[in-house]
Amino acid sequence: RDSTTHQSHFRGGVGVTKISFKPHGFRAIRASVMPSEGQQQSSLGDSLVNSPHRNDVVDVIRKSAISNCLSETNLHNTVPGLVSKTRGKVRDIYDAGDYLVLVTTDRQSAFDRILASIPFKGQVLNETSLWWFERTKQIVPNAVVSAPDKNVTIAKKCSVFPVEFVARGFVTGSTDTSLWTVYNKGARNYCGNVLPDGMVKNQKLSENILTPTTKAADHDVPVTPDEIIERGLMTRSDYEEVSEKALSLFEYGQQVASEHGLILVDTKYEFGKANDGSIMLIDEVHTPDSSRYWIASSYPERFQNGLEPENIDKEFLRLWFKSHCNPYEDEVLPDAPEDLL
């Protein structure tokens, strides 16, 4: 058959989404796993790895996957009980009364806009967050109720603070609000943090800091703690509690990353308040979308030589777009090459 339709069922009756795809190249796949004459039958995995057709198979899978991303959902049109949809940059959020159904799509955002769609990215983000939510609930409770699908999380509703808490351990970044960008322009006090002269890009800070932002016209706007309180965005007690939890989460994330050969460079947290007044962690935790990760083993030498650290986050995509266009001002952006995705 030239095409098939894959149905992903949310367990518990939450919903159904359909993704159509066209898996070309079945001959190459079949050839890759068929043993030659005189060869003993090996496992499917070994046959694929050792096959002379391996590269053909990988290319078929890659090309098929790129055209079959989960870029849009409309569950509110078909699932009873979902009364409305809010489309975020990456997540489609459905109102289900006392709960929210959050579908993490494959959309890739940066510079406050959508850049591309990346196969299986939504699943990676959702399952990464769930892993961290489970391991950080001793630091702060979270809103997660269940995960009926690899791309879906059901969460408790709460009153969301209109402030994002960005925790940073290094002077780095390429966006307009990144610490290196503002530092390189001469800022020495950023979001209430006093920074010394003489720092260079990708240098480690003497201690972790918070650089809160708030939303204005779909853009992140840096704010100081005093501005947050004066503008009524948070009470002083809520801000102090949340900022303490954010730094504790970041320190724990850095510790776990270090144990796995990584550096958690910076990240973003969002919090809300439950009906009982308790603070809850929401949205996502320590994902490659909300965080920067570097390879720890190569960082010292690359830093000394003035090279960009090896990263496993979306910084490579940011850098590509920055070198090929103005992602903040250009109305139409170039398509990212398939090899990059």
Swiss-Prot record:
* Gene Ontology CC, one term: chloroplast stroma
Chemical reaction(s) catalysed: 5-amino-1-(5-phospho-D-ribosyl)imidazole-4-carboxylate + L-aspartate + ATP = (2S)-2-[5-amino-1-(5-phospho-beta-D-ribosyl)imidazole-4-carboxamido]succinate + ADP + phosphate + 2 H(+)
Q: Which GO terms describe its biological process?
A: 'de novo' IMP biosynthetic process
Does the keyword Transit peptide feature in the UniProt annotation? Answer: yes
Q: In which pathway does it act?
A: Purine metabolism; IMP biosynthesis via de novo pathway; 5-amino-1-(5-phospho-D-ribosyl)imidazole-4-carboxamide from 5-amino-1-(5-phospho-D-ribosyl)imidazole-4-carboxylate: step 1/2
Q: Which SUPFAM superfamilies match?
A: SAICAR synthase-like (SSF56104)
Alphabetically list the UniProt keywords. Answer: ATP-binding, Chloroplast, Ligase, Nucleotide-binding, Plastid, Purine biosynthesis, Transit peptide
Documented EC number(s): 6.3.2.6
Q: Which domain of life is it from?
A: Eukaryota
- Give the top-level enzyme category: ligase
Q: Where is the signal peptide?
A: none
InterPro entries per record: SAICAR_synt/ADE2_N, SAICAR_synthetase_CS
| MF (Gene Ontology) | ATP binding; phosphoribosylaminoimidazolesuccinocarboxamide synthase activity
Report the subcellular localization: Plastid, Chloroplast
Can the keyword Metal-binding be found in this entry's annotation? Answer: no
Would you identify the family this protein belongs to, as annotated? Belongs to the SAICAR synthetase family.
- What protein is this chain from? Phosphoribosylaminoimidazole-succinocarboxamide synthase, chloroplastic
- Origin organism is Vigna aconitifolia (Moth bean)
* Gene behind this protein: PUR7
